[in-house]
Amino acid sequence: MFAFYFLTACISLKGVFGVSPSYNGLGLTPQMGWDNWNTFACDVSEQLLLDTADRISDLGLKDMGYKYIILDDCWSSGRDSDGFLVADEQKFPNGMGHVADHLHNNSFLFGMYSSAGEYTCAGYPGSLGREEEDAQFFANNRVDYLKYDNCYNKGQFGTPEISYHRYKAMSDALNKTGRPIFYSLCNWGQDLTFYWGSGIANSWRMSGDVTAEFTRPDSRCPCDGDEYDCKYAGFHCSIMNILNKAAPMGQNAGVGGWNDLDNLEVGVGNLTDDEEKAHFSMWAMVKSPLIIGANVNNLKASSYSIYSQASVIAINQDSNGIPATRVWRYYVSDTDEYGQGEIQMWSGPLDNGDQVVALLNGGSVSRPMNTTLEEIFFDSNLGSKKLTSTWDIYDLWANRVDNSTASAILGRNKTATGILYNATEQSYKDGLSKNDTRLFGQKIGSLSPNAILNTTVPAHGIAFYRLRPSS
């Protein structure tokens, strides 16, 4: 039995034009980097951060855009007599300024963590009521990014206004320091953050914490479906759970302020290769931050080749900043072991007049899927040039780095990294304008008016395309 959903949304001006003034000039594209929490949790140290940064650089990932090295919870040992935070000397013997300087000297950016509560989620000192002292601590230690959590908030939530003012206090304090600091809210979407986040922050989490499961329900993540206004966000939320919650929120994100679907689980847990590809593709397409959650010293070749797929990253870093829209959604009868099964089609405009299209199979069997120009350009009027033109179809995964080459790179063969796109030398925007083939995938055909785009999509997998006006 099928159930059908078709999206007809009132799009904000931000969604139409892809323009949102960044409140602090940062976050013009979604942030990319690495965060320790998903793999290491509280097992953090100076050595972990610096070794990870060196490895990310050696793997060519820094020059693909993964430049933020984000230290999560558990770094503090308390406060000094003046009320300033103190780093744990056992974990960070040279202090946070040393970490920042090492990262900056190697062209990385340094991120740290606190919580808009009395304590952090792991029970360390929080920043509620201490915003100015703590913002100055971060600025003094040359921090470039703050992840700001939501634990132990003393009940200061329940309406958008209450949460807004609690998070605005740190926003104001960061700005007062005079240091540009990317401000990443982690309040789990509580109190409709997507409505007010862009006025005070550069990104905002929109759900409970992700887990390395594609569809598995979990009682600790009680809301599902399209419950974007979840009263108890929880954690251990599956990839499809978070994606469906994010579906209506794209109209409230754009340049300078992004919906954050949480860190990437590629290379974490036991996701299949098709699930990892779908996960990475959809996070890229909806313009979520691309934050590696894996241990980069222990990546398998297939996961590395996903993180380094320039044609997919280029979708995420597209300068117009418009998240893709879910155009349709069907439930299907071939459910998986958890009773989950659905298929979806997503579409979104790109800066150079191209269009990104995804056919997502959340069912348990491989299946034929299709779409048309009328669905792809669902907002266009009949007779629109988009509907009467022929479009070339590029498979965004067709030129993926093979496992042999990925293994060579992981084995520290620096020559092998020469095939990778280098966004430090040439931005994604410039590479697209110069038709760098690494950013387009492989042309597999064309789609003419009244024709149908047909493909076969594996279970828990994706077909991911860039459409370009036919040459």
Swiss-Prot record:
CDD domains xrefs: GH27 (cd14792)
One of the record's GO molecular function terms: alpha-galactosidase activity
Glycosylation sites: 105, 175, 270, 370, 403, 413, 422, 435, 454
Assigned GO CC terms: extracellular region
Entry keyword set: Disulfide bond, Glycoprotein, Glycosidase, Hydrolase, Secreted, Signal
Reactions accelerated catalytically: Hydrolysis of terminal, non-reducing alpha-D-galactose residues in alpha-D-galactosides, including galactose oligosaccharides, galactomannans and galactolipids
Induction statement: Induced by galactose and melibiose and repressed by glucose.
Superkingdom per UniProt: Eukaryota
Chief subcellular location: secreted
GO biological process, one term: melibiose catabolic process
Localization per Swiss-Prot or TrEMBL: Secreted
Keyword Coiled coil: no
SUPFAM superfamilies named in the record: (Trans)glycosidases, Glycosyl hydrolase domain
Cystine pairs: 42-74, 121-151, 221-237, 223-230
Signal sequence range: 1-18
EC number: 3.2.1.22
Binding site for substrate: 72-73, 147, 205, 251
PROSITE patterns: ALPHA_GALACTOSIDASE
Active site, per annotation: 149, 209
Assembly notes: Homotetramer.
Family: Belongs to the glycosyl hydrolase 27 family.
Cross-referenced PANTHER family: ALPHA-GALACTOSIDASE MEL1, ALPHA-GALACTOSIDASE/ALPHA-N-ACETYLGALACTOSAMINIDASE
Protein name: Alpha-galactosidase 1
